[in-house]
Structures are given as C-alpha cells and as structure tokens.
Amino acid sequence: LLLSLILFFIIFELYKCKFIYDIYDYIITFSLIFILIFVVHKYQIINILNFIFIFLVLINVYFPNFYLKKIFLISILIFVYNFFSILLIDRNIFYFIFFISFLNDTLAYIFGKLIKGPLIIPSISPNKTWSGTLISFIISLFVIYYFDNPIILSCLLSISLFFGDIFFSYIKRKNNLKDFSNFLRGHGGILDRLDSMFFFIII
C-alpha cells in the first residue's frame, strides 16, 4: 500500500511537470508488458501498473527515435522485473536499497555543503561537488560491503547511485525543472528522493 501511494505521487509529479502527454502510441505495448508481468507477479498488479506507466511516459519524452524506444523499453522491463523479484524474494533487501539510497543522498548533501570544492557536472547538477560525491561513495561502499557483498559488486552499486542521480538531474535540466515537485518541503518531490536507486535496482 505504501509503495502504491509513493508511485501515485510520482505519477502526479510527472503530470504536474507536463511529462505526461501523447502516450497513445504505447497503449498496445503497455498492454503486452502488463500481461507479461501479470503472469510472473500476479500479486503485484497495482504496483507494476504504476511503474510501467511512469517509465513509458519517460520513454515517450526522451526517446523520439523508434528503435531507441524499443531498446529502452526492454531495459525498463528488466528493471521492473528485478524490482518486484526483490520484493517477492526478500523485502529486507528492498528496504536495504531504500536505506542505502537515502544514506548516499544525505551524505553527499551534508559533506558537499561542509567541504564544498569544485563541482562535478555544473551544467547538469549545479550543487553536486567532488567532495560530497566521493565521501558518500566511500561510505556507501563500506556499508554495502559490510552486508556480505563482494567488493566489486559493492563498488558497482555505489557508483550506480551517482549515475541514477545524474540521469534524473539531466532529465530535469532538459525540461527546465529544479525539482519534480515540492511535495517534500525543501527536498523536492518523491521522484527526486528515489532517483539514485534507478540503476542500483537493475544491477
């Protein structure tokens, strides 16, 4: 129920930012994916519907080329499948992903403000510094490794948090948005808080 509410607000944020438009070309594709995943995870139908809807919207906005859409659609299908596989296998892993994502964002913000220094990609993320990013990466790496994960996997997961954040920051800059919404006062919207886990879950 909580996850469904979170995803509902994400959809609302995308609608408010005018991300949602002209998706009628994807009704058939949406239906096929919906049926496929329903067979695999019949008890997660509402959450899956929300996720697919969100990412079909993103595909429509950012990938006007037909073949790119198909390639990206496959990657999104993998993402959704992995996400709900995690939920069904072990909810503790799901909660761990949320915790690591929150920890990484918080550390990057705090140390970026304290130490400051040069920015990484000012044109995309004007507040993200090298100091905050490196410290959050190192601490996240050790936390992930502490829970019996191989060191290489821990590194990949820690790096993925950064790229998820940058990816959604790029989307916002392309659409002249500071945040997806102001639902969380001073912290943007729900989607702004969950962006870093996008590639984390896929890995």
Which sequence ranges carry the predicted segments?
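Membrane-embedded alpha-helical bundles of polytopic integral membrane proteins
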Residues: 1-127, 133-158
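Residue-level preference for nonpolar/small residues embedded in alpha-helices
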Residues: 103, 163-164
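Cytosolic, membrane-interface loops and tails of multi-pass inner-membrane proteins
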Residues: 106-128, 167-189
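Short amphipathic alpha-helical surface patches that serve as generic macromolecular interface elements
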Residues: 153-156, 164-168
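Hydrophobic transmembrane alpha-helical segments of multi-pass transport and channel proteins
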Residues: 159-163, 190-194
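Final/C-terminal transmembrane alpha-helix of multipass membrane proteins
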Residues: 193-203
